[in-house]
Amino acid sequence: MNKTTEYIDALPLTVAEKATLPATDIRTLHETLNPEHHDYAREDDSPLGSVKARLEQSWPDSLVNRQLTEDDEGRTQLETMPKATRSSISPDPWRTNPIGRFWDHLRGHNATPHHVSRLTKEEQAHEQKWCTVGTIRRYILLLLTFSQTALATWYMKTILPYQGWALIDPIDMIGQDIWISFMQLLPYILQSGILILFAILFCWISAGFWTALMGFLQLLIGKDKYSISASLAGDVPINPEHRTALIMPICNEDVDRVFAGLRATWESVKATNQQQHFDIYILSDSYDPDICVAEQKAWIELLAEVQDKGQIFYRRRGRRVKRKSGNIDDFCRRWGSQYSYMVVLDADSVMSGECLTSLVRLMEANPNAGIIQSWPRASGMDTFYARCQQFATRVYGPLFTAGLHFWQLGESHYWGHNAIIRVQPFIEHCTLALLPGEGTFAGSILSHDFVEAALMRRAGWGVWIAYDLPGSYEELPPNLLDELKRDRRWCHGNLMNFRLFLVKGLHPVHRAVFLTGVMSYLSAPLWFMFLALSTALQVVHAFTEPHYFLQPHQLFPVWPQWQPELAIALLASTMVLLFLPKLLSILLIWCKGTKEYGGFIRVTISLLLEVILSVLLAPVRMLFHTVFVVSAFLGWKVAWKSPQRDDDSTTWREAFMRHGSQLLLGLVWATGMAWLDLRFLFWLAPIVFSLILSPFVSVFSSRASVGLRAKRWKLLLIPEEYSPPKVLVDTDNYLMMNRNRTLNDGFMHAVFHPSFNALTTATATARHRKSKVLEIARDHHIEQALNEPPDKLNRDCRLTLLSDPVIMSRLHYCVWAMPEKYASWVNHYQQLTLNPSALKQCEPNIEEEADYAEPTAQIDMALPGTP
C-alpha cells in the first residue's frame, strides 16, 4: 500500500469521503483538500493549502466560534488570541542603596511615588479608620512579642550554667596567657551566642503564636467588621463595562490536570450565568515541544467541550522573559487595557463561579482595593504526606490567615494566585524591573508576588485577604522531596526580595513581610547554629575544667549551675507557644462540629498523626533549608522548574541519596552525645532520631497507598473530601477523561499526523513575509533536522521547527512523500505508541457509524511504513 493511501486512512473522514480522494501522490491529495486552490510554487508547500480542511475535519465543533483567517502570505491561521490593544509598561529601576537614595534626595530627585486620591470623603474616612486601627494593632503585636521575648530571654540567661558574666574583665586578661584567657571566655562566648539565637528564634515563634491566637478569637467570635467580605451586598449586578480576565500562566505543567481544572472552573462560572463578564487566557511559557503540542490539542478540545463563544484563548510565548512575572507583564501590555480586573490562577488552581463573581463584586464595592487575595483550600492529593499537609492547612490555616488579616487589614499578603487584581494600577505601578548588580541575587525577581503587593500598596491601593471567602482551591506537593524542591526556589526568591527592604516609599507592613519571608528560611540555619552551640557548650563542659576564679583577687568561686527544673519549665513554655495554635485549631473544630473531619475521635487522632509527622520532619527541613540558604549565598543557581502535580512516591534510592547525609549526621550526633552525657542525649532525642529516621519517613509518607488507607479509615479527612464541592468533583472527572486521551510524543505527531500537523501549522506564530534569506534559513533547519535521527534533535531545534508554519508543512510533506529518504524519522515514529483515545475529538460526528473504520485501525494506518 502506498503512503498516500495510508495518509487518507489517517484522515477523520467517512469511508465514502475517503473514496473521493485521489491516492496518486501526496501533492495531488493536498491540492484536492485545498478548497481555496492556492497555487504554491514549491511542491513541499502543498500541505499549507489543506490546513483549513484538515482542521475543519478534525475539530469542527471547536471552530464554530473561532476564526480561521489567512496571514499576509495566504497561509491558514487559527486565531488563538484576540486583537491586541497595547499599553505602555515601563518599570522603574530599583534604588536599593540607601547612600544613593540619600544622594538623590540631596539633588531633589525624590523617587517616592505620589498618588492622587480616588475616593470620596466617606470612603477616605473609612480607609483612614482601618489604617489607624491596623497601626494600633501592630504596635500591640510588637509590644506583646518583644515583651514575651525579653522575659523568655532573661529566663534563659538565668538557667545557663556559667553565671560569671559580670566578673569578666578583658583588661585583667591582657597580661595572662592567651590560651588560658580563651578557655576562660569560651563558655561565655558560646552562651552569648546561644542567648542571641534564642532571642531571635523565640521572637519568631512568639509572633506566630499571637497571630494564631488573634485568628482564633476572630473566628470564635465570628464577626469581623473590617473583613473585606463584609462589604458584599448580596448578588448585586456586575457592571458590564468591568470585564475580568482569568489568566493562567503555565510552564511545562501537567496538561491533563491544567485543562481539567480550567474546564471545571469555567463551567462553574457558566452555572452562575455571569460568564459574559469573564474571559480565560492560558499563557504558556512551556519549552518542552511535546508538552507544547499537547497544550494546543487540549485547548482546541476544550473549546468544543464548553461550547466556547470566543472567550477562551491560548498563547505560547516565543521569548521567555522574566518567567511568570514577565508572562503576566506581556498579557497586561497586549490585552490588559481590555479588562478592569484579572484573576491569576496557578496550574493547579480551581475556583468556583461563586468565588470568582464574589471577588469581582468585592472589587466593585471597594474602589480602593488593588488586590484581593482569596484563601486557597488544599485538596486533591492522596499520598500520606500530602494528606497530612492538606489536613494541617485546612485545620490550622484558618487561624493563621484570619490572624494575618487581623494584624495587616488592607496592607496584606498576595500569594501570586487565586487572587483578583485591578489591572490598570497593576500596569502602572507593579511592573518589576531587574534587580541591579551581578550574582544570584540580581536579575529577574523570583518571588514576584510579595513585591507586587508592596508596590500596589505603595501606590495607595489596598491589598486584602478575603480569608472567609469559600470556593478557592489548590494542590500541594505529593511528597517531602518535591516540597523541598519548591522551598529551594522560594528560599532564593525571599532572600532576593530582602534586597528591596530599604526601597523608598514601601509601607512598613510590607517591609515586615519581606523580613518574615526571609525568616521563614533563615530561621533554619539559626536553629541549627543554636543546636550546634548548645552541643559545643556541652563538649566544653565535658572536656575542660571549669574556671572558678575569673579575676586575680576573686574571693568566692563561680560554680557552674545546673537547674533542670527551670530548663524544663522554659522548654514547656516554648512548647506551649509552638503547639497551642494547633490545640486552638482543634478546639475551634470541636466547638463548631467535627462531622466533616471524620468525627471527634478521628479528628483528634488525625491531629496526633500530623503532629508526629511534623515533629519527625522539622529537623529534616531545618537541614535542607540551611543548605538552601548557604547555597544561595554561595551563588549556586536555582532551576525554576514546574513542581510535581500528581501523586508521586519517593524511591528508596532517591531517599537515601537525599537523606543519607542527614542519617549519618544523626548517628554521629547521637553517638557522640551518648558518649559524653546520656542526659544531654535526652534533650536532643527529637532532633537526632528524626534525622536517623528521615529516609524511612520520607519514603513511607510519600506512598499513596498509605494515604488512601488513612482516607478509608476517615483519618486526615477534610471537608472537601467529606462533602466535595461540585467544582472539585468535576475536576477529578475531567482529569480522568483527559488521562484516557492524553497525547504523548506530541512533536512527532505534529510532524506526521495530518490532524496534529494542521493544528500546529495553524497556530504557529513565526509568520514572516517572503524573503530569500528566510527561505535559505528554513531549508537549512529542515535539512539539519531530517539528516539526523529525531531523538537526537535538541529541544531548541524542535521549538524552532514548531514555531514556523512553513517548516512544519514542509517537514510533513517530506516524511510522507519521501519515506525511504527519511527512514530514520519514519522508523522512529513507527516505534511510538499513539493513545487510541487521543484522536477522540478528531472522529467525525455522523449518524451512520457503519461508514467508519475502527479507531485503532485508523491509528495503525497513520503510521508511515505500516504493512
From Swiss-Prot:
Span list, region Disordered: 71-91
Organism superkingdom: Bacteria
Signal peptide: none
Transmembrane segments: 139-156, 194-216, 518-540, 568-590, 603-625, 680-702
Keyword Hydrolase belongs to the record: no
Role this protein plays: Involved in the biosynthesis of osmoregulated periplasmic glucans (OPGs).
NCBIfam families in the cross-refs: PRK05454.1-1 (NF003955), PRK05454.2-1 (NF003958), PRK05454.2-5 (NF003962)
SUPFAM superfamilies: Nucleotide-diphospho-sugar transferases
One GO process term, biological-process aspect: glucan biosynthetic process
EC number: 2.4.1.-
Principal location class: membrane
GO CC, one annotated term: plasma membrane
InterPro entries registered for this protein in UniProt: Glucans_biosynth_gluTrFase_H, Glyco_trans_2-like, Glycosyltr_2/OpgH_subfam, Nucleotide-diphossugar_trans
Localization: Cell inner membrane
GO molecular function: hexosyltransferase activity
UniProt-listed Gene3D superfamilies: Spore Coat Polysaccharide Biosynthesis Protein SpsA, Chain A
Pathway membership: Glycan metabolism; osmoregulated periplasmic glucan (OPG) biosynthesis
Protein name stated in the entry: Glucans biosynthesis glucosyltransferase H
Organism: Nitrosomonas europaea (strain ATCC 19718 / CIP 103999 / KCTC 2705 / NBRC 14298)
Keywords on record: Cell inner membrane, Cell membrane, Glycosyltransferase, Membrane, Transferase, Transmembrane, Transmembrane helix
